[in-house]
Amino acid sequence: MTDKYAFSLTTFSPNGKLVQIEYALNAVNAGVTSVGIKATDGVVLATEKKPTSELAIGASLEKVCAITPDIGMVYSGMGPDFRVLVDKSRKVAQTTYKKIYNEYPPTKILVQEIASVMQESTQSGGVRPFGVSLLVAGMDEKGPSLYQVDPSGTYFAWKATAIGKSSTAAKTFLEKRYNDELELDDAVHTAILALKETFEGELTEDNIEIAVVSTKPTDSGIVGVPGGHFCRLSQSEIRDYLDQV
């Protein structure tokens, strides 16, 4: 009976499920693990980075992307779907919202827009759900925040969470280690340790990517934009953190 609904994009099965969304979640769970942790003075996003070949240039594989100078996001799942959502998010933040209000959107507003785009693909003919889950970190007048958005368009705010293949083990680790007084530096160490719990092999600056959203504006910002709160850590900075754990 389930097979009858497996390829329908918009039809509920008798037990109330959209099977294509479950398949999209399977794509997320097949992806590498990504971790997000909210600290008292910022948010850290960390993810595994596995080149498909030893000949690939690792530095060209970016999994953490800036949406505005103060908001960044990472994914687990299908990379091409993520790129589409990054483009749509940037269009909303930097074109639509900024033209009207002359400022970038607060983190929650942007998350709601992303979630709406993802939800629409679950009820429209001729499309399929996005095969990604997102962790969105941002800084606005309310302080640092961390959200998770799933293929169904569901979103929640989190103190700390993980998505991807080893998310269950990573969440269990975070539940043991997290506390409300955690500062950003400690959060980076905790994120690395959470990935290390389930990583096959040795973590190096070449196979992990880390970005932070800090309460303090960065000197260089992103892509030359000064004063932003989002910053992707360099390989040398990641190496220093790895040496400390």
Swiss-Prot record:
Cellular component per GO, a single term: proteasome core complex, alpha-subunit complex
Swiss-Prot/TrEMBL GO biological process terms: proteasome-mediated ubiquitin-dependent protein catabolic process
Organism: Schizosaccharomyces pombe (strain 972 / ATCC 24843)
Subunit structure comment from the entry: The 26S proteasome consists of a 20S proteasome core and two 19S regulatory subunits. The 20S proteasome core is composed of 28 subunits that are arranged in four stacked rings, resulting in a barrel-shaped structure. The two end rings are each formed by seven alpha subunits, and the two central rings are each formed by seven beta subunits. The catalytic chamber with the active sites is on the inside of the barrel.
The protein, known as: Probable proteasome subunit alpha type-2
UniProt superkingdom: Eukaryota
Family: Belongs to the peptidase T1A family.
Primary localization class, coarse: cytoplasm
Protein role: The proteasome is a multicatalytic proteinase complex which is characterized by its ability to cleave peptides with Arg, Phe, Tyr, Leu, and Glu adjacent to the leaving group at neutral or slightly basic pH. The proteasome has an ATP-dependent proteolytic activity.
